[in-house]
């Protein structure tokens, strides 16, 4: 076979290069390199303005209320042994700042409260006055496999067992 022959039949499929020709590489709008352009506005202002989280990560940050050792963590915890008995370790050292003390996020808290109040309008909460027994099958989802008999199978209406 001659080497000039195209092995792919017609119609030839078009792609990005054959349809519109070669595309130009997009040029940067600035002639400055990136490391020099970052010294101008708005880059400089964004870099120099600290947030609460970024200021805590700096070397010079010192918070007088932070616990210094394990004893301080346990003493400042929001855990009350009389109210929360048999909680796991992570719940016993939960700090007030994490639980919900005001730590400077006032705007987020106001938004949260307004959303919750708007969502809960018209919802009635019902609490059962009598605690139901764990072993009662009353009100359970009906199925032919329940633990209401010795073998774990329910009985048919005629007294026999269901089988699969």
Swiss-Prot record:
Keywords: Cell projection, Cytoplasm, Cytoskeleton. Transmembrane segments: none annotated. This is Protein CFAP276. It is found in: Cytoplasm, Cytoskeleton, Cilium axoneme; Cytoplasm; Cytoplasm, Cytoskeleton. Residues 155-164 have a biased composition (Basic and acidic residues). The lineage of its organism: Eukaryota, Metazoa, Chordata, Craniata, Vertebrata. Microtubule inner protein (MIP) part of the dynein-decorated doublet microtubules (DMTs) in cilia axoneme, which is required for motile cilia beating. May play an important role for the maintenance of myelin-axon integrity. May affect intracellular Ca(2+) homeostasis. It comes from Danio rerio (Zebrafish). Its main location: cytoplasm. The gene is cfap276. Residues 145-164 are annotated as: Disordered. GO terms for cellular component: axonemal microtubule; cytoplasm; cytoskeleton. InterPro entries: CFAP276 (IPR022179). It comes from the Eukaryota. Pfam families: DUF3695 (PF12494).
């Amino acid at each position: 076979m001659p080497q000039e022959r195209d092995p792919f039949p017609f119609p030839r499929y078009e792609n990005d290069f054959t349809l519109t020709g070669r595309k130009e590489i997009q040029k940067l709008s600035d002639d400055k390199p990136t490391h020099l352009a970052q010294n101008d506005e708005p880059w400089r202002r964004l870099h120099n303005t600290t947030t609460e989280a970024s200021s805590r990560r700096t070397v010079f940050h010192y918070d007088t209320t932070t616990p210094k050792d394990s004893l301080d963590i346990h003493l400042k915890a929001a855990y009350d042994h009389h109210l929360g008995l048999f909680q796991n370790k992570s719940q016993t050292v939960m700090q007030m700042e994490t639980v919900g003390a005001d730590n400077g996020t006032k705007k987020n808290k106001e938004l949260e409260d307004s959303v919750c109040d708007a969502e809960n309008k018209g919802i009635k909460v019902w609490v059962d006055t009598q605690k139901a027994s764990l072993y009662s099958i009353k009100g359970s989802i009906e199925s032919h496999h329940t633990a209401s008999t010795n073998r774990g199978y329910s009985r048919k209406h005629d007294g026999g067992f269901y089988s699969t």
